[in-house]
């Protein structure tokens, strides 16, 4: 056989043989070695060739087993794998295993490279023949002892195991020898990884399938000792080679396995156990809740957690799931050579149920090789023996090539704590070795809590630490050889297997974070097997393994290139601080290498960043951050591998918390990388601190002892108490994970998806979505990090489809996406040379960023309308990636969805550019900056708990400091990055559309329009500095990067160093290439024309809603009628053809769009107006307002049917759309009617009432004033609205009409001249804008509303706002004051008549007091009027001064009506002289008359003097104005009025002439023959008409004013002589009247009659018929009306519609009529007695010039149906004039 083995050296690897050959080889081996051997410890033991103990059935079998063991140990040539020196432990001095070692094996080499060389076919046959032999190493405590060999029989004695167990307990105090738990767990871990070996190597049919099927996780099994319903005891969870599979999904029932064979006695029992285990696993897979998908460290795949089986009475090295046999298991030791400690626990139980008929399993350890066999009383079938042999071969090969022989001789520490160290271990576990309790539940709960989570995610108090071992002379054996490995070595496959499964065996293994960080510190990284995500066991022998090694070498080169980045990101060593325990004792904590302690080894220099804690305290490693290029992991692999839940959550009552990193990524502003294990560790500690949970820092490397043995230790050691179970996972986290998982499967079809499309995945519920968003934002690493980039895009798209915006979620999700983008070697994939195969390839393909995912991401972010810092950077990164894809041709126009999503991405980016940047979140206080990133988030997701002590929080603060997830790009702001990404994206997109016309054909009409819109917006934003985003880019490009260096140097230190490897070490250095190389987007007209043509050709395919959208897009594109006429023409044709079928909402959108575009196509507008009229009854209030505002206010397009229908629908009681309008809508509605001069009394009244109903809470003062102004422009008066607005504006609410705010004191000259008196009566409310005051004053003047105190408030307001208003507003204020003042200076009052004195004489004495009070009131009124006249004169003078001092063109263009009226008023007041005094006043001497007459004469003289002063001031200011310009303005006004009122004036003048001819007087007749006017004209007293003349268009006051119809009469008033007979009824003579009157007053009456009879009065009268036209009618034509432009110097509401030139508003009416109406005024429509303010001013000016004015209203004249009615009205006018002349 040895010759065969020697010949087999250098042959092909054993595991690469064909499957058929392997089957034949194993069959021959099994036929040769049929009998199995049971090796039992203690009784019969023998040493075989280097310490292997073999229980033989015969010499031949023993020899075969020995040759097989020797072959598997020595002859196989292991492959070369470089091992880092810090992973190689010192050797053991007294172990004989070193004599049989090879040089390659001592260097950490394994079977992954070229292993198996030297194995021949005969060796394979011999190995298979010896597979049924079990070799176990006996427990050794010192030097190697010889052992006896015993022959195993089917019925072996039952006392050996119990004796061995009792000896071990009596010697060590608990169930395991020194190091037994750790070494035993190493065998378990090696057996755990055996299926990977089987999967990597070919196997016979029926064997590899069963071996590759993972066994049931222990959490799916019922607890030991509890009977099942079938009457059988439940199987205890075992840990064996079949327990580790490729994933953690549902597994098939474990095959019936006993290590080397099955006896007839145990065959049925094992089958039942397997069936029971399968049923339990299937049931658990359905009933168990999903585990938390916590992301593992980079390169590490999660594996199922294995629990300790010692408490359940099952041997750890048993591959099957067997029933516990009390008192039968013997403690044993086993060791596995390798750089990683694979620790487990042995089983020890009480002596109950000693009569149980069951087999036992033992194991012995020698030279690191452990082979276990069980032989029962019954025989085994060939299939079972084949499986057992296969398992034995795999186990031995694993232990040989991946394990290290030897064990620890370190003495036990004091206090009963056992720290087991081996020659190959770098960490130990204590939770797996549990005490031998009665039922084992306490130990199980303790171990479950410790090992149910991966190492990087365990609570800080329970994470395993790396103990130190004594150095120097104690390093012997294999460890001494291993210490000579080079420093650049790589981990072995055993380490890869250990790192691939986060927790192997019954306890936590070496912290993977330590491996990764140590590798990073050494400048290396883990094996390529880890990065490939494949099964680590012996995979290197296959092509996949070679590819993985090549990828690892490539990553090593990349790591070397970025070594500077990794070194910069490493934080300095954290200063150690004491950790407060439960008992208050603070142990000593050291940093770096500490003093050698018993049971601990010296740490190498590479692990100097770990904190070493004294005995009883776990060490918390603090690893430096790992750069993104050093940790490249497949995101889909981490996301798709769920983490199983420990059985503590199912079988025990203790809660279990899935403690996960909770570091928030909301503050990440740049590309981030994945969280390292140190970050996860600190985050878990922060979560624990935030939840207020204080855990017992029990030593995880020491096994738990029995109650009896550990009682003294518990009393003496404060840290021996078991740790409290972690809190359960919050329900909101579970719900959030479920919702996000369902949303991650959502595939959006377009950017218009709504909530309905989410129903198949996750039906939209606001509460559920909000809770999930809050949980994900609080714990992004737990809920968002496991998702891949396409899944994150699907989640954002789901929230966008639901319309649910949660800004913290968007920030956290963008941060996670940036981390994945940076951690995968750039967005979109890993290394270029890696070609993964199989499942890894599919996973990588699903995790990579795709074109669809990037477009979906951008579209969803734009739809949600949020642009924070992380979101902006993510959008910029996605834009750069899309531009690269388009540039390289990776995306080609080959599918319809590509065109759809390209258009959506362009639209989304342009939309994001236009969104305002979100306000940055204020940073936390410096004291709690580190804790705020993790602790508050964890506290929100956990139940309320007691706060942690201050000491614990203070000591844990440095441990919470985590490195940044990504290097901060301190170079540029997010806005600048967004602009740069937009430039690249739109440039490449335009080029792609230009080069590949297929993109156009993949877009429909809407998508082409959206793309055109996006390109237009990009040209505006990134074009030659016109836009907002381009300003920062090009200012920086022109001025260099110095500005950015000063403004963007916020991130220093680590962020700058991290950014150096990515394009910028500092702010200035990074800004230089960014700004200088920033391209500028140049608009491509050819591409835009192509897109416009594509959209135009597809307009007929659009529905009405899409047609409305096309209107909006064409508007926002800035297309004018002359730029792309074919687009508007096609749109017009489609709209006119389908106008009748368009719904109200699209109609409103179309009309509003055309209004903004100023489209004045009458046919197009008429079609839309008629369609709106037909749909008016179905329109909502806001749609009605939008349509009327567009037609009326913007386009000035008057459609009679449309406006009338709107008035009916809005104001009729049955419809009453006004009830649903707000103040702004009411204002716009009435403004549309005012703009088109469409008068609807019902609507105007209803609008005013609605505004009053809204009140001050529903409307503002400006809105109420605006409505009042619109009503004034329509000549509609609403008294209630007037009073409310005036009271609110000028503060007149407290002034009662009785008091009128009039001062009772005549006052001094100071009160007469200043505005203080006016301010005392009332002033404008403080804080109101000047435009509002001017608008209200204008409305009051136009509607002739003068409440008490208004003039005083107006004068005070004018003095206050005069310096702040323009010329137009000054003219409006002066016009309002002039109109509201009433009388003018030098105007005669009714009290100046001659008969007033006689009436006072005739008053009785009883009325003397009332007369005195009335006289006092009259004097008060006269004084107030005098005061107002002074203020008015001052205002007019200041107005003329401002008019002459202005530099603008004079006369000003608008509002010209007020300027003309003011100029006419000033001219009239300055040039007209007051009429002469009456004749009787001139004839009487100055000394005669009563006292009243004397006072009246004094007042007349005073008023004449004041009139002279006023005239002098006005003349001086008028002379300063250019005379020619003023004459030209007056001439224009005169001609316009003459042309407008010429026909009507001639008609009135002809009727007046006809009436005067009836009373014609013959000029040749003498005074005796003249006839008086008819008595029915005059009444008493009679008068005689001497002459009359009628003319039209008479100019008065030096041409400043025009009289419409002038009538000049000469009459003689007095008593006729008695001899003269008058026509008609006779009249009584004066004498007869004297004789008839009796009484005391007879003498006075006779004197008066004699005076009038002796002095007849002859008087010349000037009668002015002032024609008052109605407001101009609205234009009845559909011709568009241009909107009026405001004056350059005017602003505010004073330059509104009423202050504009009427000719510019209504071209439908003649210009002359419009100007005449503005100059002369018109009647108020809803008032029969009041003229407008302009008409009142004209009448007062004519009266001041000496004319008797009779207003003639157009409405009254038009109502006269016949000539007789017209003559009767003219007679009434003449009668009124004659009566006024006779008084």
From Swiss-Prot:
Transmembrane segments: none annotated. Residues 126-157, 186-205, 224-242, 277-289, 343-374, 420-436, 577-599, 655-669, 676-709, 928-970, 1403-1417 have a biased composition (Low complexity). Keywords: Chloroplast, mRNA processing, mRNA splicing, Plastid, Transit peptide. One of its GO terms (cellular component) is chloroplast stroma. Residues 307-316 have a biased composition (Polar residues). It is found in: Plastid, Chloroplast stroma. Residues 256-273 have a biased composition (Basic and acidic residues). Residues 1-40 form a transit peptide. Residues 97-378, 420-484, 563-610, 652-709, 918-971, 1395-1427, 1476-1506, 1620-1639 are annotated as: Disordered. Residues 1494-1506, 1620-1630 have a biased composition (Basic residues). InterPro entries: LCS_TC/CRSF, RAP. PROSITE patterns: RAP. One of its GO terms (biological process) is RNA splicing. The N-terminal 453 amino acids are dispensable, while the C-terminal 630 amino acids are required for function. Part of a 1700 kDa complex that includes the precursor RNA to exon 1 and the tscA RNA. This is Trans-splicing factor Raa3, chloroplastic. The gene is RAA3.
């Amino acid at each position: 056989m040895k010759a065969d083995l020697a010949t087999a050296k250098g042959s092909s690897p054993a595991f690469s043989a064909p499957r058929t050959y392997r089957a034949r080889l194993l069959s021959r081996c099994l036929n040769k070695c049929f009998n199995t051997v049971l090796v039992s410890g203690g009784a019969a033991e023998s040493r075989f060739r280097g310490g292997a103990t073999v229980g033989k059935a015969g010499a031949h079998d023993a020899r075969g087993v020995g040759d097989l063991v020797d072959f598997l140990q020595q002859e196989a040539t292991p492959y070369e794998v470089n091992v880092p020196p810090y992973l190689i432990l010192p050797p053991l001095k007294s172990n004989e295993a070193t004599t049989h070692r090879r040089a390659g094996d001592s260097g950490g080499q394994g079977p992954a490279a070229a292993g198996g060389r030297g194995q021949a076919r005969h060796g394979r046959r011999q190995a298979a023949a010896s597979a049924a032999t079990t070799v176990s190493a006996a427990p050794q405590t010192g030097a190697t002892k010889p052992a006896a060999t015993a022959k195993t029989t089917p019925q072996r004695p039952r006392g050996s195991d119990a004796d061995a167990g009792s000896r071990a307990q009596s010697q060590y105090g608990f169930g395991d020898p020194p190091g037994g738990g750790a070494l035993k767990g190493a065998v378990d871990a090696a057996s755990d990884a055996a299926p990977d070996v089987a999967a990597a190597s070919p196997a016979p049919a029926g064997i590899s399938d069963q071996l590759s099927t993972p066994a049931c996780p222990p959490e799916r099994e019922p607890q030991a000792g509890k009977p099942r319903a079938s009457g059988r005891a439940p199987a205890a969870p075992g840990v064996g080679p079949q327990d580790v599979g490729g994933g953690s999904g549902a597994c098939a029932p474990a095959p019936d396995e006993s290590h080397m064979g099955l006896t007839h006695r145990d065959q049925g029992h094992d089958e039942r156990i397997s069936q029971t285990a399968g049923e339990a696993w299937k049931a658990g897979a359905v009933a168990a809740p999903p585990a938390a998908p916590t992301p593992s460290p980079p390169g590490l795949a999660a594996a199922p957690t294995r629990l300790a089986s010692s408490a359940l009475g099952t041997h750890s090295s048993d591959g099957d799931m067997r029933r516990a046999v009390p008192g039968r298991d013997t403690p044993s030791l086993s060791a596995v050579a390798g750089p990683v400690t694979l620790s487990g626990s042995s089983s020890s139980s009480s002596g109950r149920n000693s009569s149980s008929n069951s087999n036992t399993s033992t194991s012995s350890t020698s030279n690191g090789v452990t082979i276990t066999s069980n032989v029962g009383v019954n025989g085994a079938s060939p299939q079972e023996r084949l499986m057992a042999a296969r398992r034995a071969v795999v186990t031995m090969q694993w232990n040989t090539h991946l394990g290290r022989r030897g064990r620890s001789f370190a003495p036990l520490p004091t206090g009963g704590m056992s720290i087991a160290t081996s020659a190959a271990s770098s960490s130990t576990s204590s939770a797996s070795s549990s005490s031998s309790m009665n039922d084992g539940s306490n130990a199980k709960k303790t171990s479950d809590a410790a090992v149910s989570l991966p190492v990087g995610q365990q609570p800080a108090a329970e994470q395993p630490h790396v103990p130190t071992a004594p150095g120097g002379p104690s390093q012997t054996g294999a460890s001494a050889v291993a210490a000579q490995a080079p420093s650049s070595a790589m981990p072995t496959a055993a380490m890869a297997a250990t790192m691939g499964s986060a927790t192997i065996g019954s306890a936590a293994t070496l912290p993977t974070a330590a491996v990764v960080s140590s590798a990073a510190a050494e400048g290396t990284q883990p094996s390529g097997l880890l990065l490939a995500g494949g099964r680590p066991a012996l995979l290197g022998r296959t092509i996949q393994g070679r590819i993985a090694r090549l990828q690892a070498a490539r990553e090593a080169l990349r790591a070397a290139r970025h070594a500077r980045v990794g070194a910069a990101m490493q934080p300095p060593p954290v200063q150690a601080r004491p950790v407060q325990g439960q008992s208050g004792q603070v142990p000593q904590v050291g940093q770096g290498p500490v003093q050698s302690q018993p049971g601990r080894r010296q740490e190498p220099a590479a692990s100097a960043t770990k904190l070493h804690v004294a005995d009883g305290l776990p060490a918390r490693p603090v690893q430096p951050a790992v750069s993104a290029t050093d940790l490249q992991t497949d995101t889909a692999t981490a996301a798709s591998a769920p983490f199983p839940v420990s059985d503590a959550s199912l079988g025990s009552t203790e809660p279990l918390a899935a403690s996960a990193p909770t570091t928030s990524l909301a503050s990440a502003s740049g590309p981030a990388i994945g969280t390292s294990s140190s970050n996860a560790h600190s985050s878990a500690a922060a979560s624990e601190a935030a939840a207020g949970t204080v855990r017992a820092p029990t030593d995880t490397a020491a096994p738990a002892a029995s109650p009896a043995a550990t009682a003294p230790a518990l009393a003496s050691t404060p840290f021996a108490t078991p740790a409290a179970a972690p809190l359960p996972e919050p329900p909101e986290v579970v719900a959030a994970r479920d919702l996000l998982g369902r949303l991650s499967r959502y595939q959006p079809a377009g950017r218009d998806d709504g909530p309905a499309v989410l129903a198949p995945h996750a039906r939209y519920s606001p509460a559920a979505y909000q809770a999930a968003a809050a949980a994900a934002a609080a714990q992004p690493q737990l809920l968002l990090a496991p998702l891949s980039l396409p899944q994150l895009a699907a989640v954002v798209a789901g929230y966008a489809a639901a319309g649910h915006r949660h800004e913290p979620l968007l920030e956290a999700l963008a941060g996670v996406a940036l981390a994945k983008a940076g951690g995968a070697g750039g967005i979109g994939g890993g290394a270029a040379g890696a070609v993964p195969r199989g499942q890894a390839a599919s996973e990588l393909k699903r995790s990579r960023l795709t074109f669809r995912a990037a477009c979906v991401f951008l579209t969803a972010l734009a739809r949600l309308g949020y642009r924070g810092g992380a979101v902006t950077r993510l959008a910029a990164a996605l834009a750069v990636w899309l531009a690269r894809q388009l540039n390289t041709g990776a995306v080609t126009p080959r599918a319809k969805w590509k065109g759809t999503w390209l258009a959506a991405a362009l639209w989304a980016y342009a939309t994001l550019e236009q969104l305002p940047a979100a306000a940055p979140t204020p940073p936390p206080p410096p004291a709690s900056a580190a804790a705020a990133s993790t602790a508050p988030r964890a506290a929100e997701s956990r139940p309320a708990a007691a706060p942690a002590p201050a000491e614990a929080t203070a000591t844990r603060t440095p441990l919470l400091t985590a490195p940044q997830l990504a290097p901060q790009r301190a170079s540029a702001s997010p806005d600048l990055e967004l602009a740069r990404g937009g430039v690249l994206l739109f440039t490449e997109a335009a080029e792609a559309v230009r080069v590949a016309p297929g993109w156009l054909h993949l877009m429909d009409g809407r998508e082409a329009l959206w793309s055109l819109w996006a390109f237009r917006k990009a040209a505006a934003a990134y074009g030659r500095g016109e836009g907002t985003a381009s300003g920062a880019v090009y200012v920086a490009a022109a001025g260099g990067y110095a500005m950015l260096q000063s403004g963007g140097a916020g991130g220093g230190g680590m962020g700058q160093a991290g950014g150096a490897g990515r394009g910028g070490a500092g702010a200035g250095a990074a800004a230089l290439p960014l700004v200088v190389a920033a391209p500028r987007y140049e608009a491509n007209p050819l591409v835009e024309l192509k897109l416009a043509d594509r959209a135009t050709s597809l307009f007929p395919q659009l529905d009405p809603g899409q047609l409305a959208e096309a209107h909006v897009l064409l508007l926002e594109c800035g297309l004018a009628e002359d730029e792309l006429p074919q687009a508007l023409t096609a749109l017009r044709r489609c709209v006119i053809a389908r106008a009748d079928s368009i719904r109200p909402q699209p109609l409103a959108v179309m009309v509003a769009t055309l209004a903004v575009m100023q489209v004045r196509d009458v046919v197009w507008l008429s079609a839309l107006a008629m369609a709106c009229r037909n749909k008016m009854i179905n329109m909502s209030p806001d749609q009605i307002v939008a349509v009327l505002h567009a037609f009326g206010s913007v386009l000035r397009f008057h459609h009679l049917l449309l406006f009338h229908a709107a008035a009916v629908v809005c104001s009729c009681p049955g419809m009453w759309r006004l009830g649903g309008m707000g103040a702004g809508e009411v204002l716009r509605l009435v403004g549309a009617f005012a703009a088109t001069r469409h008068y609807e009394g019902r609507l105007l009244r209803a609008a005013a009432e609605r505004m009053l109903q809204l009140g001050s809470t529903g409307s503002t003062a400006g809105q109420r004033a605006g409505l009042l102004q619109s009503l004034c422009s329509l000549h509609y008066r609403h008294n209630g609205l007037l009073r409310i607005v005036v009271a609110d504006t000028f503060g007149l609410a407290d002034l009662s009409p009785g008091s009128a705010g009039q001062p009772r004191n005549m006052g001094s000259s100071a009160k007469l001249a200043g505005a203080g008196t006016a301010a005392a009566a009332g002033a404008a409310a403080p804080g109101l804008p000047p435009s509002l005051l001017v608008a209200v004053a204008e409305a009051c003047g136009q509607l002739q509303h003068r409440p008490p105190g208004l003039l005083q408030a107006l004068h005070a307001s004018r003095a206050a706002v005069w310096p702040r208003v323009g010329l137009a507003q000054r003219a409006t204020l002066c016009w309002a004051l002039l109109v509201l003042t009433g009388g003018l200076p030098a105007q005669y009052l009714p009290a100046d008549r001659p008969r007033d004195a006689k009436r006072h004489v005739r008053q009785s004495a009883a009325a003397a007091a009332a007369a005195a009070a009335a006289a006092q009131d009259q004097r008060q009124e006269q004084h107030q009027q005098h005061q107002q006249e002074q203020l008015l004169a001052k205002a007019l003078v200041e107005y003329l001064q401002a008019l002459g001092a202005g530099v603008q063109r004079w006369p000003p263009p608008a509002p010209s009506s007020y300027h003309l009226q003011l100029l006419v008023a000033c001219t009239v007041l300055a040039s007209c002289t007051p009429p002469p005094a009456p004749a009787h006043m001139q004839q009487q001497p100055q000394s005669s008359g009563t006292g009243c007459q004397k006072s009246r004469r004094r007042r007349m003289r005073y008023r004449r003097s004041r009139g002279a002063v006023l005239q002098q001031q006005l003349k001086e200011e008028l002379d300063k104005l250019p005379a020619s310009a003023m004459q030209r303005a007056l001439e224009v006004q005169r001609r316009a009025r003459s042309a407008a009122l010429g026909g009507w004036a001639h008609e009135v003048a002809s009727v007046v002439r006809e009436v005067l001819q009836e009373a014609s007087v013959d000029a040749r007749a003498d005074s005796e023959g003249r006839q008086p006017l008819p008595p029915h004209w005059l009444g008493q007293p009679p008068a005689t008409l001497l002459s009359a003349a009628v003319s039209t268009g008479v100019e008065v006051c030096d041409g400043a004013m025009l009289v419409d119809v002038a009538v000049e009469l000469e009459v003689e008033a007095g008593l006729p002589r008695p001899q003269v007979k008058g026509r008609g009824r006779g009249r009584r003579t004066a004498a007869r009247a004297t004789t008839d009157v009796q009484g005391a007053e007879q003498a006075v009456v006779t004197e008066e009659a004699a005076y009038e009879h002796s002095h007849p009065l002859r008087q010349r009268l000037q009668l002015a018929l002032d024609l008052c036209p109605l407001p101009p009618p609205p234009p009845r034509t559909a011709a568009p009306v241009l909107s009026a432009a405001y004056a350059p110097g005017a602003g505010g509401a004073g330059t509104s519609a009423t202050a504009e030139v009427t000719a510019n508003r209504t071209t439908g009416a003649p210009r002359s009529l419009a100007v005449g109406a503005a100059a002369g005024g018109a009647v108020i429509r809803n008032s029969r007695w009041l003229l407008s303010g302009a008409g009142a001013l004209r009448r007062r000016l004519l009266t001041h010039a000496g004319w008797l004015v009779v207003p003639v209203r157009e409405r009254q004249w038009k109502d006269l149906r016949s000539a007789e009615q017209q003559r009767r009205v003219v007679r009434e006018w003449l009668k009124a004039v004659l009566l006024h002349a006779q008084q």
